[in-house]
């Protein structure tokens, strides 16, 4: 495998069919996620496929902000979250309880789970958009295809794969009529679905496109680099504590001596002592908490 293909997004367009597509392979970015928490094997598959899918779905958005995919389950897998920003940075985390390995995805998620897609602008959080649908399908790819069809009315084909070394995916999406012959979509997506997981994980974008679509007219765009990045910061944690309120923070300080927050995505620790809290709220929060108890 050529290192040039590592952590790369490749967008492409068909000249003779109403289809646009993208291929992504995550190596270093995926390893950064795995290095931060010991995920069970079954959860690695889900999280890796979601990570690849988030980059593919964000690839066609003209949008300054982040696309967030969430799967909420009621079984052993409680939550899987992936965020991809328009600068092609990604992060991911998950919560689970109990044994996950050896069970199909539906069993891991339990009954009544839901899929949430959020578009969060970087500057104006009031313009955040969210779509929520029931989980339908036996794989992350099927669930996302169903979401796109129900929520966006977009025919989509997703092939996703995740292993210990890399996570990868290909997205094909039908464009409105007028972008080539109508039956072009059926032909292209059928070809696309012949792509195997080991090919996705083992071949570069150029080889995959040639193998699948050598009889089609494919226009490729410049490759883009994808990387892991967590945008947590002490300032953001401070804002969160401010929203919690001085009384709550004072109570924790009274009981534990400090407030410690650990980022779910990157495991960065943020510790706030009494002096930090007093600066944050502009009054003695511990004295106030002590007084409230008497």
From Swiss-Prot:
Subcellular location, principal: cytoplasm
PTM section of the record: Under oxidizing conditions two disulfide bonds are formed involving the reactive cysteines. Under reducing conditions zinc is bound to the reactive cysteines and the protein is inactive.
Localization of this protein: Cytoplasm
InterPro entries xref list: Heat_shock_Hsp33, Heat_shock_Hsp33_C, Heat_shock_Hsp33_N, Hsp33_helix_hairpin_bin_dom_sf
Listed Gene3D superfamilies: helix hairpin bin (1.10.287.480), Hsp33 domain (3.55.30.10), HSP33 redox switch-like (3.90.1280.10)
UniProt record, GO biological process: protein refolding
GO molecular function annotation: protein folding chaperone; unfolded protein binding
Cellular component, GO annotation: cytoplasm
Family: Belongs to the HSP33 family.
Superkingdom of origin organism: Bacteria
Pfam families xref list: HSP33
Keyword tags: Chaperone, Cytoplasm, Disulfide bond, Redox-active center, Zinc
Protein's recorded name: 33 kDa chaperonin
């Amino acid at each position: 495998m050529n290192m040039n293909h590592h952590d790369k997004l490749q967008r492409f367009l068909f000249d003779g069919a109403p289809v646009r597509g993208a291929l992504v392979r995550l190596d270093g970015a995926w390893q950064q996620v795995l290095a931060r928490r010991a995920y069970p094997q079954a959860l690695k598959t889900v999280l890796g496929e979601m990570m690849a899918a988030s980059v593919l779905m964000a690839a066609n958005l003209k949008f300054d902000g982040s696309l967030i995919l969430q799967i909420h389950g009621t079984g052993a897998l409680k939550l899987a979250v992936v965020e991809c920003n328009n600068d092609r940075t990604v992060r991911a985390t998950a919560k689970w309880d109990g044994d996950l390995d050896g069970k199909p995805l539906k069993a891991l998620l339990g009954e009544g789970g839901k899929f949430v897609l959020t578009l969060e602008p970087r500057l104006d959080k009031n313009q955040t958009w969210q779509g929520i649908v029931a989980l339908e399908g036996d794989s992350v790819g099927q669930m996302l295809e169903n979401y796109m069809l129900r929520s966006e009315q977009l025919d989509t084909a997703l092939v996703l794969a995740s292993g210990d070394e890399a996570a990868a995916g290909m997205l094909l999406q039908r464009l409105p009529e007028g972008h080539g012959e109508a039956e072009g979509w059926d032909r292209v997506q059928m070809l696309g679905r012949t792509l195997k997981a080991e090919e996705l994980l083992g071949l570069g974008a150029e080889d995959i496109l040639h193998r699948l679509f050598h009889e089609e007219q494919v226009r490729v765009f410049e490759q883009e680099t994808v990387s892991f990045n967590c945008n947590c910061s002490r300032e953001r944690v401070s804002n969160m504590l401010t929203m919690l309120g001085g009384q709550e923070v004072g109570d924790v300080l009274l009981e534990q001596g400090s407030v410690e927050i650990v980022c779910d995505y990157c495991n960065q620790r943020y510790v706030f002592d009494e002096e930090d809290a007093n600066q944050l709220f502009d009054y003695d929060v511990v004295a106030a908490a002590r007084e409230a108890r008497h």
